[in-house]
């Protein structure tokens, strides 16, 4: 998963933004600190960014800043879980979860019809995986259990959910701040899903 | 947060408290607070120590205060000496004494008339710096306005408008001049509009760059305009 990097100068050119804007977004935490990668070059130290991620983020900021204030944007990108609560019906109405997946989730989780953010995330992840046909219901239960067991971690860090199969037996794991994962050749990687992206997707659907 | 009905914590003379929620906290004399406090107004006039975090609407330090934790307040005024081991979050920060922060400073407006030392990054919308400062990380502000009275240092400076001016010295100032270096030392300066005097930097990048007297700049990279004073040394300047 080694990424292509882009230097700050090229980024400004490519995205058509100024230093002032870039630093302002950094101050507002719209661009995470980890993306500022310092490397020494022949002119001294230079800052680089993961190219794909930063361009996508800047694109998002630029299209959304017309409607939203920078602070509202910052809330959206921040991994901190908002103290949001929603009802089961609301989630279905807003197309975050389909009724079928919601019923499956509620069969396995009996803590009521009011959803706070961690539960919304769980059900959203299930929805994504089940609807795309990548996992079956049994695997869904397994994913749910991993997400529930590690809920405190998911809150703070950028996590990635990885599901893999070998000889028809599936397993799943949660990666925290990892660079790369490698499997032996008989293993099939079913899906790797960034929970951070999921959170952003949910938030953009809610707004 | 409802602090209206909370009591006050006032320590006159030598005393200690275990912290908690208050309306008004005043440490006169030698006061120690052993854990976190949350209050509407915090004031320290003598020598105070807080061993936890402080959350307040206004915080005023006129004496000598030391904080083992973080300060989070709308308005922070330092007229004496304040030592903060972790971070300082303040909407408005005014320093006319000496403030040293071990972690980072996050603010909207920083007005500095004294000495400010920051271990990590310093972020603000407006940074007005007079006298002296040392910033271990990045000084990131929309408007950076520096008037040099002494030796200032920052690892990097970034923002939209960056102005560094030499203070027009008084008579006494010129007498003692050989003992004090009035200059700003930094690795990088990046901004849209940059105007510098008495600055030593390795790299300056910007759209409109104006290099004034007594500058030593390694490389200037500009996109629109560039001008250089005859008393400035610029290693290389290129339009990109």
For each predicted feature, which ranges?
Chain B
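Extended beta-solenoid/beta-helix repeat architectures
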Residues: 1-240
């Amino acid at each position: 998963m080694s990424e292509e990097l882009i230097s700050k100068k090229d980024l400004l050119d490519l995205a058509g933004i100024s230093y002032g804007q870039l630093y302002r977004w950094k101050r507002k935490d719209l661009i995470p600190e980890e993306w500022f990668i310092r490397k020494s070059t022949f002119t001294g130290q230079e800052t680089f960014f993961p190219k794909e991620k930063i361009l996508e983020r800047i694109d998002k900021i630029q299209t959304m800043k017309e409607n939203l204030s920078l602070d509202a944007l910052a809330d959206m990108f921040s991994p901190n879980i908002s103290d949001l609560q929603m009802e089961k019906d609301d989630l279905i109405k807003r197309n975050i979860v389909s009724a079928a997946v919601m019923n499956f989730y509620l069969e396995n989780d009996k803590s009521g019809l009011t959803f706070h953010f961690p539960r919304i995330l769980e059900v959203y992840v299930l929805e994504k995986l089940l609807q795309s046909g990548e996992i079956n219901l049994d695997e869904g239960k397994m994913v749910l259990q991993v997400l529930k067991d590690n809920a405190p971690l998911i809150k703070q860090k950028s996590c990635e959910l990885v599901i893999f199969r070998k000889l028809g037996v599936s397993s799943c794991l949660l990666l925290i701040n990892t660079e790369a994962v490698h499997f032996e050749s008989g293993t099939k990687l079913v899906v790797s899903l960034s929970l951070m992206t999921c959170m952003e997707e949910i938030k953009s659907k809610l707004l | 947060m409802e602090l209206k009905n909370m009591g006050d914590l006032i320590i006159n003379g030598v005393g200690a408290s275990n912290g908690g929620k208050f309306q008004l906290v005043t440490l006169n004399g030698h006061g120690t607070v052993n854990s976190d406090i949350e209050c509407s107004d915090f004031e320290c006039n003598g020598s105070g120590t807080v061993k936890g975090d402080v959350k307040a609407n206004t915080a005023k330090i006129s004496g000598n205060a030391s904080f083992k934790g973080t300060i989070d307040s709308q308005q922070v005024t330092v007229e004496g000496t304040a030592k903060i081991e972790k971070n300082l979050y303040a909407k408005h920060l005014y320093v006319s004494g000496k403030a040293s922060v071990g972690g980072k400073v996050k603010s909207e407006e920083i007005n500095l008339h004294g000495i400010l030392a920051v271990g990590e990054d310093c972020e603000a919308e407006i940074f007005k710096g007079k006298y002296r400062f040392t910033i271990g990380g990045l000084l990131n502000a929309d408007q950076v306005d520096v008037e040099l009275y002494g030796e200032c240092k920052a690892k990097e400076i970034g923002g939209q408008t960056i102005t560094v001016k030499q203070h027009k010295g008084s008579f006494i100032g010129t007498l003692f001049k050989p003992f004090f270096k009035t200059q700003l030392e930094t690795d990088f300066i990046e901004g849209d509009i940059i105007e510098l005097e008495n600055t030593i930097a390795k790299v300056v990048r910007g759209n409109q760059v104006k290099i004034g007297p007594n500058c030593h700049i390694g490389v200037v990279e500009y996109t629109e305009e560039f001008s250089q004073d005859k008393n400035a040394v610029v290693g290389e300047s290129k339009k990109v």
